[in-house]
Amino acid sequence: MGIRFLKAFTPGTRNRSVSDFSEITTTKREKSLSKMNHRSKGRNNRGVITCRHKGGGHKRLYREIDFRRDKIGIPGKVMTIEYDPNRNARIALVMYEDGEKRYILQPNGLRVGDSIISDLQAPILVGNALPLRNIPLGAQVHNVEFQPGSGGQLARSAGALLDILAKEGNFVTVRLPSKEIRLISKNSWATIGQVGNLEAYSIRIGKAGRNRWLGKRPTVRGSVMNPNDHPHGGGEGRAPIGRCRPVTPWGRPALGQFTRQPKKYSSKFILRKRK
């Protein structure tokens, strides 16, 4: 992937960059793996906003991604590398020898024509999936399961990877992208390699309208609201918030407050907290 910088023909193109999509091999999606996806846009069943700053955006068709990689022992061939509007990573269309087609996340370095396989003793090659217990120390993996059989949930974003640090007993020690070090079952499956599209986070949005295309609504500061709308609101001109610490619109502590439950069952698997 490369990044293309636009010339400042208008204020909206000044300091704006886009992907050059050089890795994309086709613009036609696989219709059998696409479906309508009704997005909630931050509202519940009554239409009440439950998550602010969401709404609008371009319509999208959801691509069904194979996060489980459960085609055990059946080789597949990469047919295309495609753009997915629902994520910042690219997806690869794989044709298996039994005729089935599936989408997977495209690891960095996977090209059209490459062969991949999911097996207990699969070779340590980019795109292959196998249990963590059979992956050597120091390997980089993505699309890792929290629980065996749950499907990949960790390291699915563009450029994400997990480092395998140690193996002991029934667990494997891994380092997450957040620098958190935790234990995961050795029977959980993972895919070899790093998720592609490494430069996705280097793109400059350039203008507010581009975020609206993505379904992101404006974020208004509490200090410019009225006092009946936010605890930070009110006052004459640019007034301080009048509290010892920032709070949310509902009065809960914000900006630095830990949100993880202190007695959560999975805390025993975390060896070092994220930074």
From Swiss-Prot:
SMART domains in the cross-refs: Ribosomal_L2 (SM01383), Ribosomal_L2_C (SM01382)
Compartments where found: Plastid, Chloroplast
Top-rank lineage group of the source organism: Eukaryota
BP-aspect Gene Ontology terms: mitochondrial translation
Major location category of this protein: plastid
GO cellular component: chloroplast; mitochondrial large ribosomal subunit
Start and end residues of each stretch annotated as Disordered: 32-53, 218-242
A GO term, aspect molecular function: transferase activity
Keywords per UniProt: Chloroplast, Plastid, Ribonucleoprotein, Ribosomal protein
Subunit structure: Part of the 50S ribosomal subunit.
Protein family per UniProt: Belongs to the universal ribosomal protein uL2 family.
Protein name as catalogued: Large ribosomal subunit protein uL2c
Taxonomic source organism: Tetradesmus obliquus
